[in-house]
């Protein structure tokens, strides 16, 4: 419907942001027909995101091109996709091609910078302590044939560490899993990231970057080409864990994070064995507010105070051939992630944030 084509998801907004403020801000791009701030059904508290609807495509395109700050706070603006469209069965080729192209301007545009993050391995964080390896394997096998599945445990106490890894026999299976970076497993919402081999992370231009002396234990790596407007990420050196944790994060409402300048070890694991992989989110991070910080990713885990760190971002782009393979995978796959947890998270009908910031 045209109604949905002109609708944008706005994430990470301040709790003081009113619908009128949201409408007034986006009116600079054209006529705003509707502005909604999502709120909890019971408490009425803002959930940290909202929606705006324009009158035409031109206004939508103009809004998507810019970096946005509302009430002095950086926000994430993406295309909105309705929930019933994502879960409609069966998938048609036309539907999938249209949705793939809608993802933040389409895969062709996203892959134009030449950066890819194809991998056969995924990182799964936020696992319940009751999740068994068999349950873990059974869930992720629905997306493709697996060659290795492991739930990480502490080497001393044998207690679960709250994360694991899944390796598929095909990179295309990973692309199918990453169509949603939130899944429900053992009645708990978990987050999925691409696990990129260490040798797969390198500087785009090889240039050295100066960072303050206090960060001498970090390694600064350019993220994406300058035209995308993103900054750099700070990485722990490989000897620390074997994969990169980010710096301490301060949570925005509804799971947004902004990186602070303090080292952090999370997943409740003081000591972690090397895994040899980095964890990469499925889409570029929004623009930085200073040279060292940026809004990292939508972690979306429980906000009970448990430390949940981000990971060094790699761009999500998929090549044209991979996009075709992904579509064919989708035709045969019946996603089963439309769950009560999603409904609780989204007030019944608000939808869930997807990779690339799209919203369903």
Curated annotation (Swiss-Prot):
SMART domains: RRM. Residues 6-82, 120-197 form the RRM domain. GO terms for molecular function: mRNA binding; single-stranded RNA binding. RNA binding protein. Can also bind in vitro to single-stranded DNA. It holds the Pfam family RRM_1. This is RNA-binding protein 1. Keywords: Coiled coil, Repeat, RNA-binding. The gene is RBP1. CDD domains: RRM2_Hrp1p.
């Amino acid at each position: 419907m045209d109604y949905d084509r002109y609708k944008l998801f706005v994430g990470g907004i301040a709790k003081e942001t009113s619908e009128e403020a949201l409408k007034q801000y986006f009116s600079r791009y054209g006529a705003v027909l509707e502005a909604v701030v999502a709120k909890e059904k019971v408490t009425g508290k803002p959930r940290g995101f909202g929606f705006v609807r324009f009158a035409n495509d031109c206004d939508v395109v103009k809004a998507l091109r810019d970096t946005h700050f509302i009430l002095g706070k950086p926000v994430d603006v993406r295309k909105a996709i309705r929930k019933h469209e994502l879960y409609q069965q069966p998938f048609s080729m036309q539907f999938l091609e249209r949705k793939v192209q809608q993802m933040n301007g389409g895969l062709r545009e996203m892959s134009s910078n030449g950066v890819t993050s194809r991998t056969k391995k995924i990182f799964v964080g936020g696992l319940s302590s009751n999740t068994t390896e068999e349950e873990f394997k059974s869930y992720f096998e629905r997306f493709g044939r697996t060659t290795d599945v492991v739930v990480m445990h502490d080497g001393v106490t044998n207690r679960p560490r709250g994360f694991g890894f899944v390796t598929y026999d095909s990179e295309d299976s990973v692309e199918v899993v990453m169509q949603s970076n939130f899944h429900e497993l053992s009645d708990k919402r978990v987050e999925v990231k691409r696990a990129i081999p260490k040798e797969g992370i390198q500087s785009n231009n090889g240039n050295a970057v100066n960072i303050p002396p206090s960060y001498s234990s970090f390694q600064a790596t350019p993220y994406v080409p300058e035209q995308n407007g993103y900054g750099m990420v700070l990485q722990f050196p490989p000897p620390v864990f074997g994969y990169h944790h980010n710096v301490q994060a301060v949570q925005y409402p509804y799971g947004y994070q902004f990186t602070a300048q303090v080292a952090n070890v999370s997943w409740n694991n003081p000591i972690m064995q090397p895994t040899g992989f980095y964890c990469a989110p499925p889409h570029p991070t929004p623009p930085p507010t200073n040279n060292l910080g940026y809004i990292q990713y939508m972690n979306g885990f429980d906000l009970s105070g448990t430390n949940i760190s981000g990971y060094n971002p790699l761009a999500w782009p998929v090549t044209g051939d991979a996009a075709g393979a992904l579509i064919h995978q989708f035709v045969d796959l019946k996603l089963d992630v439309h769950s009560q947890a999603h409904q609780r998270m989204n007030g019944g009908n608000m939808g869930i944030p997807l990779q690339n910031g799209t919203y369903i």
